Every structure is written in structure tokens, then in C-alpha cells.
Amino acid sequence: MIGTRLPAWTRVLACGVAGLSLMTISAKAEDVITLGASVQLSGPVANTGRYYQDAYNITIDKINAAGGVKVDGKPYKLALKIYDNQSNVNLSVRQYTQLVTTDKVNFLLGPFASNFALADSVISEKYRIPMVQGGGASDEIYSRNFKYIFGTLAPASNYFGSTVEMLKGLDPKVTNVALVYADDSFDISVADGTRKLLKDAGFTIAADEKFATNSTDFTSLISQIKSKNVDAVLVAGHETEVLNFVRQSKSLAFDPKLYSFTVGVPTEDFRKALGKDANYAFGMTAWLPSADLKDRWFGDAAKFETEYKARFNYEPDYHAASGASDVEAFAEAIEKANSLDPQKVRDALASIKFDSLYGPIAFDKQGQINLPQIVVQVQDGKLVEIRGPAGQVNPPQYPMPAWNAR
């Protein structure tokens, strides 16, 4: 039998857990609770990584301004220790190890992207320091029976769930669908779930294609899909991949009735990067600032958006809202546990229920929340909510006109 050598980060749990001195990290004399994180601040996905750094900072500052977090009647300030993992998962794992063993942070906030959360959560599990992360949605993260990882993104397998429901009622009818996805943990989970959703809904999957993560050239893939005469294209990828897919679709005059993307569409950057070519693109989000979501620290989602944009000079999207709720989850759990003991805070996280600017937070047995995805579309340069949890909100612009008819 030939064994498969596992990546270094998958072997961490096997290394010396027995005899490990578990840390109950107390606050220092300055009464500070330190949250540690490794985030993509440079490299291919830095544009999304910044949401997490900025969300962590603004939320920590907001909680501190309101008096901090109380433990046994004593107020503690929150602090952030953050590293740039340069979009390198192996570096991220080393940095989380450093945060726990050298920096001795109290608790961990997550990185962006499922492959990072999948790897980095091995560190939180090994050292039994809870991590709350809002950057990874892959079902694989929560399938390992880990006890110290909690996530505020809904399961990737159902990301296109609301979109498939919308497809059922479109006129002209959608029959043939292309499913396109990147070769990484998140996008594979999306594809696996979407494949079943499409089949159960009676759609024909005319193309089912995987591309290499961080691909820049989609011409061959688009040409292949174009030859299938599909009605709709569902793409699971990251923002740069999505931008390149749209640009190259235009250059190849590929104009299905509809295309929808897992990421990018809700962001201001997407609309700025593509200009008028962003129109008609569908996407999804678990959060909109217009939602009626009340919050203990910011007041509501709209106030969070206003403060975030004023401070960082760009609009927050669901990544930022999710990151903010991660910090809030720790504040709630620490106060519920009335302790800084990692095990007690972990147990409190497993049972907390509270309203955040992002939505209601309550973790299931696997450590994940389940918020419905909202279908959005770019219409005349603006982001429009098309379908919410209760059904259609605004009419979609469908079918998408040919590129030469715009």
C-alpha cells in the first residue's frame, strides 16, 4: 500500500498533544484581552483580506469605546495582534502557531478563504484556543468534528441555493446550465452542493468544469462552454478570477441569458473594475446594509456601513460584516463565560445566541451558522436585491442582452 504524504499543516494535530500544557491565558496588568489573526494583506486575495483587518479593528475600537468587555465585573479592553500571511497558507499556519505559542494571544480570529481556515483551524484545535472566523465557508472545515473552530459564513454547499430557486421561475425558461468552479476547498464545496441542487430542480448540467485556482486565462474554458449553448452559467471562484471571466466573456462574445458568481458582485470594487460591463451580473450575499439588523455596539447594519466607509473610504460587504460579528461573538462569549479560560469561552461560543449587525448568531453542533443567501444583481451600475429569504424583492434584468446590443 502506498501512503500519501499529508501537507505539513494536516500533521500538526499528530504532534505531541499528549503532555501539552494547555494555557489559560490571563489578562496582563493592563487588563487587555488580545485577539490574534493572520490575514491576507498582500498577494492575490489581499483585496478581500483587507475587509477582515478593517472589520476587526473598527469593531474592537467600537467595543472598547463602549467600555470594553466585562469579566467578573471588571472591564477589559480588546486588542488585535495581526500578521500578513501574504496569501500563503503555509505562512499563515506558522503565524497562527506563533500567535499562540510566542505571542500568547487569548483567542483567535480567522483568515480569509476556506483553504486557509481549513489549515489554520488545526492550530486552534491542537492548542485548544477557540477561533471564530468569517472567511471560510467550505463544508470540509466543519466535517472533522473539531471543537474549537466557529464560523459565521453559511455552508458553501448551499451558496447557490437561492439562485437555483430564482432560476426556476425565469422567463424565458432556463434549461441548460454550466457549472464552473475553482480547484479549492470552498469552490469544490460550492460545486458539490450546487450540482445536487440543479439536478433536484430538474435542470440539465450541460457543462461541469473545474479550473485551477488563481487562473487568469479562461478563453479555452469559455469557448468550450459557449459551444454547449447553455442558458445560464454559475461560477464559483474568487474576485480576480470572476473579473477575468467577465472580461474574457465579452471578448469572446459569450452571452448566455444569465451568469452568476459566488463572490465579487456585491462589492463596490467589482462595479468600479468593470464599469458598464458589470451590469446584468448576478451574485449573492448573506448581508446588505439596508437589512433591518439591530446591533449592541453599532446600533444597526446601516450605521456600521456609514462608520466603516467614513473610516476606510470604501464600502463594506458581507466579508466585513462577517468579520465584525466574529469580534462581537468573542465579546458575547467572554462575558457569558465570565472568564478568560479558553475552554469556558469555547463552551460559551457553542451556546451563545445574539443579534449582530450581520444577522442572528447561533452556532450549530459543527460550529457554523446558517444565514440564507440573498440574490443580487448589478443594474445600471447599482447593486439591487433580487431575491431574499421570503422570495422575489425586485424584478431581475433578464435575459442578459448580447454584448454588441448593450
Swiss-Prot record:
Signal peptide annotation: 1-29
GO terms of biological process kind: amino acid transport
Keywords linked to the UniProt accession: Amino-acid transport, Signal, Transport
Pfam families associated with the record: Peripla_BP_6
SUPFAM superfamilies hit by this protein: Periplasmic binding protein-like I
Family the entry assigns: Belongs to the leucine-binding protein family.
Function: Component of an amino-acid transport system.
UniProt-recorded name of the protein: Leu/Ile/Val-binding protein homolog 5
